[in-house]
């Protein structure tokens, strides 16, 4: 609760706004918006419209610095940090900073030694899913 006080009685998922809970309820009632290309369904029509751009290749948000284009504005906003040097994600162990959350999470494995991606064939562990996928080609 607290920041997300509106809770779905069907699945327990919580929302910060009552409107989002109402939209989410479409998932349980079957009142969703399916993609005609791939069949994936969405609780909100605007989410379907955003998804459909994946199939058209449309990337309407363009970086004014380098010209790179993005499907979603929030991805462009995060990309802008690569030009400013701002790194909002800090390691609590050593203070090293990162532009992307997933890079911080990968870095934190260097402190713990954790290798969460394990080969089902030989049991060898890897820090990333990509490293495991490369390894799996040897079997």
Swiss-Prot record:
<keyword id="KW-0863">Zinc-finger</keyword>
<feature type="zinc finger region" description="C2H2-type 1">
    <location>
        <begin position="6"/>
        <end position="28"/>
    </location>
</feature>
<dbReference type="GO" id="GO:0005667">
    <property type="term" value="C:transcription regulator complex"/>
</dbReference>
<dbReference type="GO" id="GO:0008270">
    <property type="term" value="F:zinc ion binding"/>
</dbReference>
<dbReference type="GO" id="GO:0006357">
    <property type="term" value="P:regulation of transcription by RNA polymerase II"/>
</dbReference>
<comment type="similarity">
    <text>Belongs to the krueppel C2H2-type zinc-finger protein family.</text>
</comment>
<dbReference type="GO" id="GO:0000785">
    <property type="term" value="C:chromatin"/>
</dbReference>
<protein>
    <recommendedName>
        <fullName>Oocyte zinc finger protein XlCOF14</fullName>
    </recommendedName>
</protein>
<dbReference type="InterPro" id="IPR013087">
    <property type="entry name" value="Znf_C2H2_type"/>
</dbReference>
<feature type="zinc finger region" description="C2H2-type 3">
    <location>
        <begin position="61"/>
        <end position="83"/>
    </location>
</feature>
<feature type="zinc finger region" description="C2H2-type 5">
    <location>
        <begin position="117"/>
        <end position="139"/>
    </location>
</feature>
<dbReference type="GO" id="GO:0003700">
    <property type="term" value="F:DNA-binding transcription factor activity"/>
</dbReference>
<keyword id="KW-0805">Transcription regulation</keyword>
<dbReference type="Pfam" id="PF13465">
    <property type="entry name" value="zf-H2C2_2"/>
</dbReference>
<dbReference type="GO" id="GO:0000981">
    <property type="term" value="F:DNA-binding transcription factor activity, RNA polymerase II-specific"/>
</dbReference>
<feature type="zinc finger region" description="C2H2-type 2">
    <location>
        <begin position="33"/>
        <end position="55"/>
    </location>
</feature>
<keyword id="KW-0804">Transcription</keyword>
<feature type="zinc finger region" description="C2H2-type 4">
    <location>
        <begin position="89"/>
        <end position="111"/>
    </location>
</feature>
<dbReference type="GO" id="GO:0031519">
    <property type="term" value="C:PcG protein complex"/>
</dbReference>
<dbReference type="GO" id="GO:0000978">
    <property type="term" value="F:RNA polymerase II cis-regulatory region sequence-specific DNA binding"/>
</dbReference>
<dbReference type="InterPro" id="IPR036236">
    <property type="entry name" value="Znf_C2H2_sf"/>
</dbReference>
<keyword id="KW-0539">Nucleus</keyword>
<dbReference type="Pfam" id="PF00096">
    <property type="entry name" value="zf-C2H2"/>
</dbReference>
<comment type="function">
    <text>May be involved in transcriptional regulation.</text>
</comment>
<keyword id="KW-0677">Repeat</keyword>
<keyword id="KW-0862">Zinc</keyword>
<keyword id="KW-0479">Metal-binding</keyword>
<keyword id="KW-0238">DNA-binding</keyword>
């Amino acid at each position: 609760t607290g920041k997300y006080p509106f809770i779905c009685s069907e699945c327990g998922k919580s929302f910060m706004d009552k409107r989002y809970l109402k939209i989410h309820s479409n998932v349980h009632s079957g009142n969703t918006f399916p993609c005609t290309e791939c069949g994936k369904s969405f609780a909100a029509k605007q989410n379907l419209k955003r998804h459909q751009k994946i199939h058209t290749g449309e990337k309407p948000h363009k970086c004014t610095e380098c010209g790179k284009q993005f499907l979603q504005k929030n991805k462009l906003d995060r990309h802008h940090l690569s030009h400013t040097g701002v790194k909002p994600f800090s390691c609590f162990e050593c203070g090293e900073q990162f532009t992307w959350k997933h890079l911080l999470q990968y870095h934190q494995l260097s402190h713990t030694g954790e290798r969460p991606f394990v080969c089902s064939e030989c049991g060898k562990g890897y820090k990333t899913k990509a490293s495991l996928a490369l390894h799996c080609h040897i079997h």
